[in-house]
Every structure is written in structure tokens, then in C-alpha cells.
């Protein structure tokens, strides 16, 4: 499991896509739906972009995994969730939710989950998130905007 975190407009979605092998099957859950993300599906035939309401996301995610073959015939290599903040926006429940995602990844043992977290200036990832075993954290930095005066 890989967790990509950073402030908005810092290239988290782009980083998530750079981790994906375009020759392998991928589910991309676009919860913060962006027009640019939908265009990615047209460029890459192995990328299926889906938008879900936040009500019962874990059940919907498991249904999609089973729909792609479940334990035995599963051809998924990656599951990207962009951004998790739309599912769990409170800091207390986020580690528990991430550990449930890790359990799903371990249970099916066929794909890697890439989770994107939008960290605001008041929402820092602390030691509570480091307790999940086998998780790689990648931080993106916000680029400074250049102002050109003509």
C-alpha cells in the first residue's frame, strides 16, 4: 500500500498515476472528480475511472474487486483512491480506515492500493499513521506559483 499526501495542487494525482504500470489493469476511484482524471481513462485503456458516493465505500470497493474476478481470476494490479478525505475527513477515523484498506489488499493479495490524502495546513500526518505495517508514505510539495507581470 502506498499513501501519497500533500497539499492541494501539489501533484498527488499525477504522482499516483506515475506509480501505475500502464500495461496492467487499474481501478481509479475519483472521489474528488476532476475533468483531467476522466481524460486519463481515454488515454489508457487499462484504467477504469469510477466515481462513488461516500456512503458505503468499502462495500462498493469489495464489490468492484469481486466484479473483476475476486480471489482467483482477478486481473487488477492497482486500485487508486483519490482522495480519501472525501471518505474520512476526520483525523481520528482515518488510520482505522487505512488499516481496513490494507486488510483488503492483503486478503486478495493481487493488487496494490494507492491512496491519495489531501493534507491541509492543519491536517498533518503524525505517528498515528505510521502504525500500519507495510505502508509506504510519499509526500508531494506544493510548487510556488510564478507571477509574471507584463
Each predicted region: which residue ranges?
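Conserved beta-strand segments of the P-loop GTPase G domain that flank and frequently precede/overlap
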Residues: 5, 29-30, 50-52, 82, ...
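Conserved P-loop NTPase "ATPase switch" module shared by AAA+ and STAND
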Residues: 72-93, 112
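Short acidic, S/G/P-rich loop/turn micro-motifs used as interaction or catalytic elements
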Residues: 9-11, 34-35, 55-57, 84-92, ...
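Phosphate-binding/switch region of NTP-binding enzymes
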Residues: 117-150
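Conserved alpha-helical scaffold flanking the Walker A/P-loop in AAA+ ATPase domains
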Residues: 61-74
Amino acid at each position: 500500500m502506498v499513501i501519497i499526501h500533500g497539499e492541494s495542487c501539489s501533484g498527488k494525482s499525477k504522482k499516483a498515476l506515475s506509480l501505475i504500470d500502464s500495461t496492467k489493469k487499474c481501478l481509479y476511484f475519483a472521489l474528488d472528480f476532476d475533468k483531467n482524471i476522466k481524460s486519463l481513462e481515454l488515454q489508457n485503456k487499462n484504467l477504469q475511472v469510477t466515481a462513488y458516493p461516500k456512503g458505503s465505500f468499502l462495500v462498493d470497493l469489495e464489490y468492484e474487486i469481486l466484479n473483476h474476478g475476486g480471489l482467483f481470476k482477478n486481473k487488477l494490479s492497482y486500485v487508486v483512491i483519490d482522495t480519501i478525505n472525501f471518505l474520512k475527513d476526520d483525523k481520528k477515523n482515518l488510520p482505522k480506515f487505512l488499516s481496513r484498506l490494507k486488510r483488503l489488499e492483503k486478503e486478495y493479495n493481487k493488487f496494490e492500493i494507492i491512496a491519495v490524502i489531501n493534507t491541509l495546513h492543519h491536517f498533518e500526518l503524525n505517528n498515528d499513521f505510521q502504525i500500519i505495517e507495510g505502508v509506504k508514505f510519499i509526500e508531494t510539495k506544493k510548487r510556488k506559483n510564478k507571477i509574471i507581470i507584463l
